[in-house]
Amino acid sequence: MIAQVSTKAHRARFLNACRGKWVLGATLPLDLALFSKSQPWRFYAGPTLALELSGSTAWAAGHANPEELASFLAFCGCESIILDENECPPPAGWCKAETLTVFGLAPGKALPLPAADETLWAGLTHGREPSAMDVARALYPADTAKQEDFYSELCTKRTRGKALVWALRQRSETICTVGAYTLANRQAYMACGQTAQPLRGKGIGGQFCGGHRPRGGVCPYVPCQSVRHGQYDIEGRGTA
């Protein structure tokens, strides 16, 4: 039976389902520790399942009965779920929307850095502790609600040493950013690597993102090994 994480037994089930997993083994336990009493997060556990809900999207570690999972997600008003296809059967009746591939770089390894436009690169300013709101606006320029949610989550993690973010600025504008948005369980989950549209294809994103990673721990971000996560939705808006 899937139940809200409200007891020590539920918490133990949740953490056991996450143990040893790439990305989900870091992000879900940290989110539970930081946001278990905050909206819009909700956390549930089954005998072999950890489930995090935020808005209409769910993240699952472990596995559950497909019929039970589909019924539970419908009850919670979820429209999509991200899960490890090698471990968790999709909810009954749901269709795959896309495949998300997670890459990992082992400790001590480095990325080959692509060539960047030297003139452009020389005119950029490197920000090691950029404003959380500046980063939020760069990532979600047209969505103030997402900006506010991103800002709140990043500030909460940053103040506890659980996230690092870097940015490149061209004059006063943030034009490239990447971050380790979860630092937990010897993993550094790198995400939200993005370059402003007019400057893409000039090598600055690859040069910048490839040159940043926290020290120590596996970095589930770049090639060495890979894990495929599937995103499924109830309406089957696409296939992959």
Language model: regions and residue ranges:
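Acyl-donor-binding surface of acyltransferase catalytic domains
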Residues: A50-L120, S226-Q231
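Short hydrophobic clusters on alpha-helical segments that form packing/core surfaces
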Residues: M190, H212-G216, P223, R228
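A conserved beta-strand-loop-helix scaffold within acyl/acetyltransferase catalytic domains
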Residues: D149-Q194
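…primarily DNA-binding HTH/wHTH and HhH modules…
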Residues: R228-A240
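Conserved acetyl-CoA-binding loop-helix of GNAT-fold acetyltransferases
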Residues: N65-F72, T195, G201-R215
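Conserved beta-hairpin
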Residues: A33-S54, K162-V178
